[in-house]
Amino acid sequence: MIRQCWAGLRLCRALYQTSYRWHGKSACERALRYSPGESIHGFTVNEVTPVPELFLTAVKLSHDNTGAKYLHVAREDSNNLFSVQFRTTPLDSTGVPHILEHTVLCGSQKYPCRDPFFKMLNRSLSTFMNAFTASDYTMYPFSTQNAKDFQNLLSVYLDAVFFPCLRELDFWQEGWRLEHENPEDPNSPLIFKGIVFNEMKGAFTDNEKVFSQHLQNKLLPDHTYSVVSGGEPLNIPDLTWEQLKEFHATHYHPSNARFFTYGNLPLEMHLKQIHEDALSKFGRIDPKTSVPPQERWQSPREYSISCGVDSFASDPEKQTMVSVNFLLSEITDSFEAFTLSLLSSLMVDGPNSPFYKALIEANLGTDFSPDTGFNNYTRETYFSIGLQGINKEDSEKVKHIINRTINEIAEQGIEPERIEALLHKLEIQMKHQSTSFGLTLASYIASCWNHEGDPVDLLKIGDKISRFRQCLKENPKFLQDKVKQYFQVNQHRMMLSMSPDEQHYDKEEQLEEEKLTQKVKALSEEERKQIYEKGLELISLQSKPQDFSCLPALKVSDIEPQIPLTDLEIAYAGDVPVQYCTQPTNGMVYFRAVSSLNTLPEELKPYVPLFCSVITKLGCGVYNYREQAQQMELTTGGMSVCPHIISDDSSLDTYEQGILFSSLCLDRNMPDMMHLWSEIFNSPHFDDEERLRVLVRMSAQEMSNGIPDSGHVYASIRASRTLTPTGELQELFSGMDQVKMIKRIAEMPDMGSILRKLSRIRKYVLLSDNMRCSINAAPQQMETASKEMEHFLTGITRSKKERKAIRPHVVEKSSNPSPSGSEISRTATRKLVGDPTFKPCQMKTHFCLSFPVNYIGECVRTVPYTHPDYASLRILARIMTAKFLHGEIREKGGAYGGGAKLSFDGIFGFYSYRDPNSLSTLSTFQKATDWAKSGQFSQQDVDEAKLSVFSAVDSPIAPSDKGMNHFLHGISDEMKQRHREELFAVTHSDLTNASNKYLTAGQCTRGTAILGPENKNIAKDPSWIIR
């Protein structure tokens, strides 16, 4: 998986995923007992550092024989994480680190079976497993809550990275190969195939990724950042198997490795296994992988590039992107990087920032350019600022505005209130608790540590905030001086512009064809024969049953039979039910509310997503939109609104439709947060056309940019559109219909009619009628929270007259959050809408897009959550993915991904992602059904599928999200326990019966959708709708 920016999460984003409350001190106490100089299983302790603000203790070590670096973060968190990363610094764009990342996971000395990595997804209870290729490092992380599982996964990961098989056929499959279009027909044409090859062809259909890649290549042109680490599709076929093996030998050595462990498991256990299984077998080398500093320019530079046309652009004439980019400080200077990240946020984040005012509100473009802000995932950090969605002729104007704004910031500085708001945001982010803190931590420190920076110093956020405040106190122009140093006088700046070319993809295709012709012409007859024979050998290998008995595995008996219960209390504030969930929230309060859409006229429904996206951004009460944003930043951790469409747990034709309001704050700020919600509910502003225009254009741009990354999601939403009433609403609210509607609105010259529609929606949903709320907070906060909820709910508007539901069939459903037999004062009632006349129908849709790969979704209507067969279908989806679809779609077909899944609303879906095939993949979906019906899987396969499903069922839940299954879905602990028992009870025959009953062609109604290039066969088939 190529992830160039994943490792460089900006500071604010990374910190947002912090910290579990310190329930106990055992893990940290154990870590504090270590002493610098102490030897443990071949490692020497270098440093032990408590970081109380994050409730952790950091232990830094080094391996005696190899020099491998090691950081252990002890914390009372059961979701333990391991990661090993290597500094990988390619000097060409063949994608060697990316293809190597894939290929090492295809078998190793201890585990020589094919694809042990994917097989372990079904033999463990992991909460995360993946691998990432960044610009200058490759990382292999996993996490799990089970100690035995941790040891199993660690064994597989260590053997994979240090002792991989690196077989030639695996290189062919994962990287690239020349192969006959039909491998069994030597007369069919030779073409390029390969998983990474197709993945990167798909990646480069994303114009934002293209822009970001060129930005880095051109701003840092002297070394590894000048190439595409993931692989340029036209360069990938230049990589040889021998070069791959050589790259592994020089880069995947312990002397070039950094190990990271996190959680409450004993450090000694990790060190012993890592030393004995891997590091003891190596000596020390000089890996020579360091990245030299970029030579600084004496004058600015400018570049122009081209890209494909965006068919969803709100204005076809405005598709140019332009940015000005500045090379900044070394990433290893952690306080300077911290300061520059804060300065960046102050310059670009939110409607009160200088660049937002100067660029976004200048009516020149639709949104900031890709990578806008502070970027800290290369040896030297950089800042980027610009616009997308502009006229090509306006590029110089944008450059002038940027220079002018920099001068204004240097002259006028930043308002103190905005600095306080940003520091308040940091305080919230340090208190907010995440279930994946270990993973976030690993990614946060990765880039700095990769270049010999101090990862422990990065964790001392409290110290940096104190030092930052002191710098401002001693020098009120501290930030202005930074602006002058890094932006006004910095000559290492680069302007990059990118404009669409209608022939772009045709030219790419022509270049690929020329590359292919060149390769084919150079082949001898013997080489052609070998290609045909190797193609047959690869198919044979991919089709041959594998023996995975060498791989470690948990057993179903290792799964906890009972779920932990969550205590919930339902109380009423007036007529509104409020769910209270007492949790150790570390000084935070979490608020949610659901307001019904049952009385909203049908003609207003398409505008609900737009209403949700803008209602907290238009101003309210005494605040204009800038003042509202400032108050939100000063008193909350964010306020969000989104559509809420949930199928009933017992009927696919019954559902809840509403709007979900969410926010969080420090406990001391709850009165201010609820006051803001009161102002939004009682006095929202719908009178600023220009503000709405800005927000709509940004939304349209964001949706358009998201299609290449989420094409399979859009295809699946479309495919399920005609299968259930909720499917129809999902397409309306979050599918391609919504994308096209927002595009149309963004093109409108007059926003008055839209504002009037939004104002009408407000009259139906910003009311206390048909509302329910929830609060998650610490025990000592509940009394205050209850009073604030009472004050809020009695202060917002109620309907002056009772409104009837637009759809006549309303079902009132009470939900009891506690197990039967327990006492509870009251229950909450949800008003669901039933559609007893709904008839599912088949529909096939092809969205013709200028992509070289396909995104495919095929869906089948099955049963709701509480149906006895739901558990069988859930297991079935997993077993079909792991035992059939993965091999057919990814290994044989060359798609980046594919599989089957069962949604909560009873839709059984097949999908593929960045797929070079289309109709043949649909045939594979049918073959998967035939395979499942015939029962060609073992009891071991069933048990593995159960493990995989339970890893999702039992994934950690943060205190902020406890009780949300009940509040949002009406699912009680008792219902979850019943479903759990049904999962345990699923048998081999249950799976074949479910396949026959629900997936058999002719007995089920299917919906199908493809997003991808034109297809002659589909165009000739009248059963397809072409869009």
Curated annotation (Swiss-Prot):
A disulfide bond locks the enzyme in the closed conformation preventing substrate entry into the catalytic chamber. Residues 814-825 have a biased composition (Low complexity). One of its GO terms (biological process) is proteolysis. The active site is at E101. It is found in: Mitochondrion matrix. Residues 1-22 form a transit peptide. Its EC number is 3.4.24.-. Keywords: Disulfide bond, Hydrolase, Metal-binding, Metalloprotease, Mitochondrion, Protease, Transit peptide, Zinc. It comes from the Eukaryota. Transmembrane segments: none annotated. Mainly exists in a closed and catalytically competent conformation but a closed-to-open switch allows substrate entry into the catalytic chamber. Substrate binding induces closure and dimerization. A disulfide bond may lock the enzyme in a closed conformation preventing substrate entry into the catalytic chamber, participating in redox regulation of the enzyme. Inhibited by metal-chelating agents. Inhibited by nickel and zinc excess, and slightly activated by manganese. Pfam families: M16C_assoc, Peptidase_M16, Peptidase_M16_C, PreP_C. Binds 1 zinc ion per subunit. Zn(2+) binds at H98, H102, E199. GO terms for molecular function: metal ion binding; metalloendopeptidase activity. Monomer and homodimer; homodimerization is induced by binding of the substrate. This is Presequence protease, mitochondrial. It comes from Xenopus laevis. The lineage of its organism: Eukaryota, Metazoa, Chordata, Craniata, Vertebrata. The gene is pitrm1.
